[in-house]
Regions:
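Conserved catalytic network of the ASCE P-loop NTPase/AAA+ motor domain
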Residues: 16-18, 64, 80, 220, ...
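A glycine-rich (often HGG/GG-containing) alpha/beta subdomain
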Residues: 1-148, 152, 156, 332
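Short glycine-/polar-rich loops that comprise or flank the Walker A/P-loop
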Residues: 19-20, 51-53, 302-306, 328-331, ...
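Generic enzyme active-site microenvironment
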Residues: 275, 309, 334
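Inter-motif core of Ras-like GTPase G domains
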Residues: 289-313
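Switch I (G2) and immediately adjacent beta-strands of P-loop GTPase domains
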Residues: 54-75, 256-284, 302-305
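C-terminal-of-GTPase-core extension/linker across diverse P-loop GTPases
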Residues: 2-13, 144-267, 284, 315-455
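Short glycine-/small-residue-rich Rossmann-like dinucleotide-binding loops
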Residues: 244, 279-280, 304, 311-312, ...
Length: 455
């Protein structure tokens, strides 16, 4: 792993330009000295108490005033990055913030790479790798669910779970390796096999639970995909528009108006639902409409929930066809046009359903409540552990595979050295998630390049 050059001081905008207030961030050994050289009154920052605010003026390299500013000074290791750090709060003008950056760079700073502040925080032990990734998730959070997941991971709930499990496995693996030093005494067993197998079983149960949470985590992070399907002119586009509170889809009495999928998202009770309006299902010779209907079936396969919009009792053949296409999905039947169409009772009463009028805005609240119920999202707290990162999911899946081989080795009565080899692979996978076993600079760069520059 590349070690930080402590003589290298970086700077970047920590907030977008154009707001009322902008923040320029500096971190590195010379951060305070460089900021002090551009600050008036002179030496005020050098003598400032740690974590204090100082009011003054920021100057360019020629001594010309750029702006009135408030400057925060943080001494290592008591800062976000663990290094000497300075944050300059100025007016949010792009010109002002750019001029401050120019002055800092001319005075010895380097423009930070994307995510470099958080990368330094990780390398300096201020947070582990999964917590660093949670910083990006927190910045990107758009609702209560994504915010809660990010805060839980940032607090270290996920990390502590893995570190505790890894420490237990490491202890027993060390005892297995100790047996190798006494291989001449085959009767010696330092690692209690019953205790080890019990721990492996508990690890399998815990990691399996985390792996299973990934589907929920991804849905919460990117939005639960909901396909709106049905025949032409049953009100699918009207339903999409009323759910989104805007005229997203064209509404017409002409059959086959919607020929392609239309997608948009909305938050319902702190959860993002990604609605997909699809082309109406019917027999047609129109080539373009046929393509749209094919895409409808594709969207059903991608959805977690399907809203089947009807305005009359479906036939048994239609039920059979829809149930087959929605196998493994959560299906809701939406009886539309309740204000004008004759009332009817569904023959399949076991399927969740709602009666609405998309045009007259009747029953929509009941439908959204049913969506939340059918989605069956777990109640999230600040301590909830939900996996939503593909890197974590893949590492956990590999760890689970290695643990399965450990159990097979027990069943076959294999020696401790063979069991130890697979246990080591489990330890590596768990360590990779928190960064304890990360050795590839390429891996770190791939993670942090997705951050904004000022973070």
């Amino acid at each position: 792993m590349t070690i930080i050059d402590t003589n290298d001081t970086i700077c970047a905008m920590a907030t977008p330009a154009g707001g009322a207030i902008g923040i320029v961030r500096i971190s590195g050994t010379n951060a305070i000295d460089i900021a002090n050289s551009l600050f008036a009154p002179k030496n005020k920052l050098a003598n400032a108490r740690p974590s204090s605010l100082s009011y003054g003026r920021i100057l360019d390299a020629q001594g010309q005033e750029i702006d009135d500013v408030l400057v925060s000074v943080f001494h290592a290791p008591h800062s976000y990055t663990g290094e000497n750090s300075v944050e300059i709060s100025c007016h949010g003008s792009r010109y002002i913030m750019t001029e401050i950056l120019k002055a800092l760079i001319l005075s010895g700073c380097r423009q930070a790479e994307p995510g470099e502040f958080t990368k330094r925080a990780f390398l300096n032990g201020k947070m582990d790798l999964s917590q660093a990734e949670a910083v990006a998730d927190l910045i990107a959070s758009t609702n209560k669910a994504t915010h809660t997941m990010a805060m839980s991971q940032l607090k270290g709930c996920f990390s502590e779970e893995l570190k505790t499990l890894r420490a237990q496995l490491l202890k027993l693996n060390s005892l297995l390796e100790l047996e190798l030093d006494f291989s001449d005494h085959e009767e010696l067993e330092f690692a209690d096999r019953t205790e080890l197998l019990d721990l492996v079983n508990r690890a399998v149960s815990k990691i399996s639970s985390l792996v299973k949470s990934f589907e929920t985590g991804v849905a919460l992070k990117h939005g639960i995909p909901v396909a709106i399907v049905g025949k032409t002119n049953v009100g699918k586009s009207s339903l999409l528009n009323i759910l989104l509170h805007e005229d997203k889809a064209i509404i017409s009495d002409v059959h086959g108006t919607t020929r392609d999928t239309i997608e948009d998202s909305i938050d319902i009770d702190g959860v993002t639902f990604r609605f997909i309006d699809t082309a109406g299902i019917r027999q047609t010779t129109d080539t373009v409409e046929q393509i749209g209907i094919t895409r409808t079936y594709n969207k059903i396969s991608e959805a977690s929930i399907v809203l089947w919009v009807v305005d009359q009792q479906p036939t048994e053949a239609e039920y059979s066809d829809m149930l087959q296409k929605c196998e493994g999905k959560k299906l809701i039947i939406v009886k539309n046009k309740c204000d004008i169409a004759p009332s009817f009772t569904l023959s399949h009463t076991d399927i969740p359903n709602a009666e609405i009028s998309a045009k007259a805005n009747i029953g929509i609240d009941a439908l959204t409540a049913l969506l939340i119920q059918v989605a069956d999202i777990p109640q999230l707290t600040e301590n909830s552990i939900i996996v939503n990162n593909i890197r974590h999911y893949e590492a956990l899946t590999r760890a689970l595979d290695h643990l399965s081989r450990v159990r097979e080795a027990f069943d076959l009565g294999l020696s401790g050295d063979l069991i130890s080899e697979d246990l080591k692979l489990v330890l590596i996978e768990l360590g990779d998630i928190t960064g304890g076993a990360i050795s590839s600079q390429e891996t770190l760069n791939n993670i942090f390049r997705h951050f904004c520059v000022g973070k």
